[in-house]
Design a protein with these regions (language model features):
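Alpha-helix C-cap/termination motif
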Residues: 46, 77, 117-118, 171, ...
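Metal-coordinating catalytic core of metallo-dependent amide/deamination hydrolases
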Residues: 15-37, 41-42, 49-162
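Active-site-adjacent C-terminal substructures of enzyme catalytic domains
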Residues: 151-152, 160-228
């Protein structure tokens, strides 16, 4: 990023999410829990009372389940109110490069049923954006998630006007998150829904992206949420 590469370019080169997934694969469940436990108590020390914790850095059935099991342990062993969010559709792993449809199949046919069988997630999330997952792929995963009782959240409009807001509203997502690139069309769509727009100014600051149009959303009467 310091060298001027975009988020999408970094992902194409195997960095970013994919690099984090490699490191997570090499970390044991107990090791991951100890790291996360330290961060949870740091958050509590800063006054955080509740957190949505996502998976999404496993990108295989085994490692996604590992992350979600750690989240369950944190729920059971800390005073923080935690909701677990299955984000297997965070990126296409290196093993599925050029075979994105097959990875979506894996999420729908193997990951979601396995997550549901163990009761590991409260929500399902998808990174619906340029260079990641399409509106059609997102809709398919949300439909399967709904069959297993997982309400959607969506990563939307971080990198482009992606259609993620509209698909989120269509499937009654609790929230659509990021929204760095949002037009009046998305704002109007949200006005006629029960979906909450969530903006992430820290992402904009860190990645050098536009800031979400919070003032425009508030002026339109939307209840805007902030996240880190």
């Amino acid at each position: 990023k310091i060298n001027g590469l975009s988020y999408e370019e970094i992902a194409k080169r195997g960095g970013g999410i994919l690099n984090s997934a490699k490191r997570l694969h090499e970390t044991s469940e107990d090791g991951l829990y100890e790291q996360a436990l330290e961060r949870v108590y740091e958050m509590i020390g800063f006054g955080t009372g509740a957190a949505d914790i996502k998976s999404g850095y496993g990108l295989s059935t085994e490692d996604e389940l590992k992350m979600l099991r750690v989240i369950r342990r944190l729920k059971e062993t800390t005073p923080l109110t935690i909701r677990a969010n299955f984000l297997g559709a965070h990126a296409v792993p290196a093993a599925y490069k050029g075979r994105q449809g097959e990875y979506v199949d894996l999420i729908c046919k193997e990951m979601i049923p396995a997550v549901a069988e163990e009761g590991l997630a409260d929500f399902i999330d998808v990174f619906c954006d340029k260079g990641f997952f399409t509106v059609e792929e997102t809709a398919r995963m949300l439909e399967v998630g709904a069959k297993y009782g997982l309400r959607p959240k969506i990563h939307a409009n971080e990198l482009d006007v992606s259609g993620g807001v509209q698909v989120g509203v269509k499937y009654n997502a609790l929230s659509v998150d990021h929204l760095e690139r949002t037009t009046e069309v998305e704002i109007e769509c949200l006005r006629n829904s029960n979906t909450i727009p969530t903006i992430l100014p820290g992402t904009s600051f860190f990645l050098g992206l536009p800031y979400g149009n919070a003032k425009g959303m508030i002026a339109a009467g939307l209840p805007v949420a902030l996240a880190s």
